[in-house]
Amino acid sequence: MNSIHKQSKIYIAGHRGMVGSAVWRALEADGYTNLIGKTSSELDLRNQDAVSEFIASEHPNVIIDAAARVGGILANSEFPYQFLMENLQIQNNLIDTAHKQNVEKFIFLGSSCIYPKLAPQPLKEDCLLTDSLEPTNEWYAIAKITGVKACEAIRKQYNKDFVSLMPTNLYGSFDNFDLNTSHVLPAMLRKFHEAKENGNTPVTLWGSGTPMREFLYVDDMAQAVVFAVNNKLPEHLYNVGTGTDVTIKELAETIQNVIGHQGDIIWDSEKPDGTPRKLMDVSKLKGAGWKYEIELLQGIKKTYAWFLEHHASLKQVKLSK
Ligand SMILES: NC(=O)C1=CN([C@@H]2O[C@H](COP(=O)(O)OP(=O)(O)OC[C@H]3O[C@@H](n4cnc5c(N)ncnc54)[C@H](OP(=O)(O)O)[C@@H]3O)[C@@H](O)[C@H]2O)C=CC1
Ligand SMILES: C[C@H]1O[C@H](OP(=O)(O)OP(=O)(O)OC[C@H]2O[C@@H](n3cnc4c(=O)[nH]c(N)nc43)[C@H](O)[C@@H]2O)[C@@H](O)[C@@H](O)C1=O
């Protein structure tokens, strides 16, 4: 039985990020009254002692791990060590502390890139570790696989409610719009917007445009987390996505239309394509009772509206070696 109730104390690690902030809003809207969070400057989750002290002083009933070193294809390939090591440090500290201090529920967020590059589509949870990973993000993927396995091991050995959710590519309010480190969707919104403002100049996009990606609006992802808080899920690993995908070229044309840009699109073949396709099989979480609501076009319009309101003060994610 699920031991969590509306007054349970819930610590959202990464509560200022795109996903963490959406989870905070969704839990509040669902009636949860005792949410806590710390910024990375208040609590560096790479520091094991600091994490242990914080959890000992707060005694949360639930930890949601939405803190990570996150970035798009270029950031992942240029900073392999940070994507591997920082993510291992953050998640190991949170998972091990949660286990040792008897936190009742732990929700780990991974990513669809944990699955093999050429796994059969749509990707089922049980194709994990059946083949090689996509090279542009294998470092990040290895960290995330380790997190999934750590939660699975704790669940198996100690029968605890530690569960992993694997989101597909996410987008929405509070996304990262920095053109070097962002994912494709926010990058396209910014590029087409700025090109339109500059008199419909050409927009340069990366790769060939042929890879396929699935996109989930962040508020739908947050509802999946609320679902995992509200229910004791019977298995350790669940994919979270829409179950449909588009080519990067189709995404570009949709965003170009939403923004009303009328210039050319140039494809920069020097930039990587990444994995050809990573469509999620989401039947397990759907079967348990969760489903997405926001279609891609609607989500793009919402995100563009958010961008227009906030782009003067957007966060700039800088990575240093
Ligand atoms: N964005 C996407 O497309 C996808 C994301 N995910 C997963 O979802 C989760 C959230 O991602 P998203 O919201 O997009 O990422 P963001 O970059 O928006 O947020 C990440 C958060 O992690 C926190 N953080 C990073 N390093 C540290 C640290 N050393 N100590 C404390 N906090 C730290 C940051 O805190 P602060 O702001 O205080 O610095 C930030 O709030 C991640 O696990 C990611 O892997 C999975 C699939 C796709
Ligand atoms: C969520 C997921 O995100 C990452 O994987 P990815 O899906 O390959 O990342 P992406 O969103 O950055 O790119 C998707 C596609 O889009 C193309 N593309 C075109 N033009 C731009 C462009 O302007 N910017 C970016 N970033 N990509 C572009 C790009 O070449 C690629 O073909 C993982 O590293 C990993 O972190 C992970 O789990």
Task: Give short role names for the model-derived ranges.
Residues 73, 108-123, 139-145, 157, ...:
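Conserved catalytic-site region of short-chain dehydrogenase/reductase
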Residues 28-53:
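Adenosine-cofactor binding site in Rossmann-like domains, unifying the SAM/SAH pocket
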Residues 48-88, 97-100, 117:
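NAD(P)H-binding glycine-rich loop region in Rossmannoid oxidoreductase-like domains
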Residues 135-168, 187-198:
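Active-site Tyr-X1-5-Lys
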Residues 13-18, 22-30, 194-321:
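C-terminal substrate-binding subdomain of Rossmann-fold SDR/epimerase-dehydratase oxidoreductases
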Residues 92-137:
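Conserved Rossmann-fold NAD(P)-dependent oxidoreductase catalytic core, especially the SDR/UDP-sugar
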Residues 114-116, 139, 163-187, 211-212:
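Flexible, glycine-rich beta-alpha linker
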Residues 84, 88, 136-148, 178-186, ...:
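Short-chain dehydrogenase/reductase
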